[in-house]
Structure formats: structure tokens, C-alpha cells
């Protein structure tokens, strides 16, 4: 596994785009796949396991639009907590505390569209995380 990481790092360092081909990233709560990205936007498919929950977090430089494709989502946005089901959506403004949770037994699948001047995975401040990940500048959604 370390050898794969070394090869990916070398491709990235040399400016090759091939390192971007592996676009699915596993997380404790499920996984995300980057479907498309360009200047000022990134589109992800996010799948959250039953009982899975992303951290309570905010981003300084991007907003997010979420569209539920399958399952039931519990969304925390600022002081509001509400549920969404398939074909419903919500908007998370820049610097708004938020969390995504799977509120059902089936996998939660959604499409996330990020917009902003910086879309790196290190633009995250964590406030609460049931998996014990770091509070700030960690690499995950």
C-alpha cells in the first residue's frame, strides 16, 4: 500500500494528471467520489453508511449544494436540523456550521456541488466528530 502512495505522490509531483484517476476516497462514514472539477467548482458523489455521520464542520472558502439521490439525510445547518429524502436539496453557505448524517437504514447517496475560490480538502474546521478525527485542517469531508 505504501508503494501505491509513493507512486501517486511521484505522479503528482511531476505534474501528471493520472494521479487524479483514483477519485474514490474511503472514510469512516462511507466514501466519496469526485465526479468532475474545474476552476471554482467540484462535484462529488457521497455515500454515507447506515448510522454514518460526517463531522460537524465549516469551510472558510467554499459553499456546498447537496441533492439527495437515495436514502434519508439528517442535515444540521447552523442552528437548524432537518431531514431530506430523494429529490430534495439544501444549500450550505460559506462559514456555516453543518453536518450530514444518514437518518435511515439504507445507504444515503447524494450529489454535492462545491463552489468557491479554494476547494482543497484541508479547508475544514471540525467541531465534533464521532470518529475522533482532528478538529481543524484535517483531510476529509
Set out the residue ranges of the language-model regions.
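A short hydrophobic beta-strand segment most commonly corresponding to one strand
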Residues: 1-6, 105-126
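A short, N-terminal "cap"/entry segment at the start of jelly-roll beta-barrel domains
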Residues: 1-45, 49-55, 124-141
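Structural motif
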Residues: 53, 65, 72-74, 97, ...
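Histidine-centered active-site/metal-ligand motif
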Residues: 57-60, 98
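Glycine- and acidic-residue-biased ligand/ion/polar-headgroup-sensing regions
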Residues: 59-79
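Short acidic-glycine-tyrosine-enriched beta hairpin
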Residues: 78-97
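Asparagine-centered strand-capping/turn motif at beta-strand->loop junctions
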Residues: 100-104
Amino acid at each position: 500500500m505504501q508503494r501505491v502512495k509513493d507512486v501517486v505522490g511521484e505522479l503528482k509531483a511531476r505534474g501528471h494528471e493520472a494521479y487524479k484517476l483514483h477519485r474514490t476516497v474511503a472514510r469512516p462514514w462511507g466514501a466519496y467520489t469526485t465526479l468532475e472539477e474545474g476552476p471554482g467548482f467540484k462535484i462529488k458523489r457521497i455515500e454515507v453508511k447506515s448510522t454514518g455521520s460526517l463531522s460537524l464542520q465549516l469551510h472558510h472558502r467554499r459553499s456546498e449544494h447537496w441533492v439527495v439521490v437515495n436514502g434519508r439525510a439528517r442535515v444540521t445547518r447552523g442552528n437548524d436540523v432537518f431531514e431530506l429524502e430523494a429529490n430534495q436539496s439544501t444549500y450550505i453557505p460559506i462559514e456555516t456550521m453543518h453536518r450530514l448524517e444518514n437518518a435511515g437504514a439504507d445507504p444515503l447517496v447524494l450529489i454535492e456541488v462545491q463552489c468557491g475560490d479554494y476547494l482543497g480538502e484541508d479547508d475544514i474546521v471540525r467541531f465534533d466528530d464521532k470518529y475522533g478525527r482532528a478538529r481543524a485542517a484535517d483531510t476529509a469531508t
